[in-house]
Amino acid sequence: MNESGSIGIIETKYAEFKELPLKNGSVLSPVVIAYETYGTLSPSKNNAILICHALSGDAHAAGYHSESDKKPGWWDDYIGPGKSFDTNQYFIICSNVIGGCKGSSGPLSIHPKTGTPYGSRFPFVSIQDMVKAQKLLVEFLGIDKLFCVAGGSMGGMQALEWSIAYPDSLLNCIVMASTAEHSAMQIAFNEVGRQAILSDPNWNNGLYNENSPRKGLALARMVGHITYLSDDKMREKFGRNPPRGNILTTDFAVGSYLIYQGESFVDRFDANSYIYVTKALDHYSLGKGKELTAALSTATCRFLIVSYSSDWLYPPAQSREIVKSLEAADKRVFYLELQSGEGHDSFLLKNPKQIEILKGFLENQSSP
């Protein structure tokens, strides 16, 4: 554990609720939400910030769980004393989405009627349902209005949904490397990943136990990971070496890297959750043009929209569509396209310019 600039040891907590009515009409009962908090809630409870994670993320956004942890939470560079989300100033909340597999209710949860994991019997969940569960947690913590909701990628979709579903419950909204809806290409990549899982001999219609569809999930992660990088970054990192020319093994370094990413992913993620969460992403849509403007018209908060020049999964054009609709709806919005060669994952990586932008947006309440 490297404590330099870190908030130190953090404990994941759990909140349980009786039920959660879902968008599709079904009811999830009971509902467990795994979450972590960093910093101190002010007496007036006006300094709370909700951080929303991406597809494979979790509630562990900062700090360490134990002295033996080698890596901190997934956004530790941005959350902590003096950082963008300054824990000396703000009370930070991060929860695992429902449908996920990191402590919140999802396919790995025990079905109350069968005593076995839900598996594919878990109800379909949407981005709206994820946000609805987060609202339960925020209220449970005694917070009426959030100072900010922030997230990248899928987390950005959740932040957008917060702005229109609960317009009176947040003052600021930060959307990074995200979109208001998936394009056909974005859906296609997710579908290939899902089909890899469904074709695994251990799939068993989603009712697997210890013999899970690891190979299929690894392939799904390999496909997804390609979209997180940029062509320039892959060329710089791997090039074309070393070409081994063996038909039975991976020929190039990039292949070995993707295999490693896939194999390591299956030890920390569930195949059913991958299907549920990617479907939630694909189904979410606020529309385009006038439809998007109308959807965002109920928002009352300030917006910061950030895109990245080399992000080809959620390219800057999709962020600009959001900005255009916010401006058409006469909303307060600041937009920045950061020059980065790291691809979609840029929002996760330490970037002095990004640190400055996030910190400045939160501190300067008079702009834009």
Curated annotation (Swiss-Prot):
Predominant place of localization: cytoplasm
A Pfam cross-reference name: Abhydrolase_1
SUPFAM superfamilies, sorted: alpha/beta-Hydrolases
E.C. code: 2.3.1.31
UniProt keyword Cytoplasm, yes or no: yes
Cellular component aspect of the GO annotation: cytoplasm
Gene3D superfamilies, A to Z: 1.10.1740.110, alpha/beta hydrolase
Molecular functions per Gene Ontology: homoserine O-acetyltransferase activity
Pathway per the UniProt entry: Amino-acid biosynthesis; L-methionine biosynthesis via de novo pathway; O-acetyl-L-homoserine from L-homoserine: step 1/1
Record localization: Cytoplasm
UniProt entry tagged with the keyword Cytoplasm: yes
Reaction equations catalysed: L-homoserine + acetyl-CoA = O-acetyl-L-homoserine + CoA
Keywords from the UniProt entry: Acyltransferase, Amino-acid biosynthesis, Cytoplasm, Methionine biosynthesis, Transferase
Binding site for substrate: R221, D345
Catalytic site: S153, D311, H344
Assembly mode: Homodimer.
Classification via HAMAP family: MetX_acyltransf
Protein name stated in the entry: Homoserine O-acetyltransferase
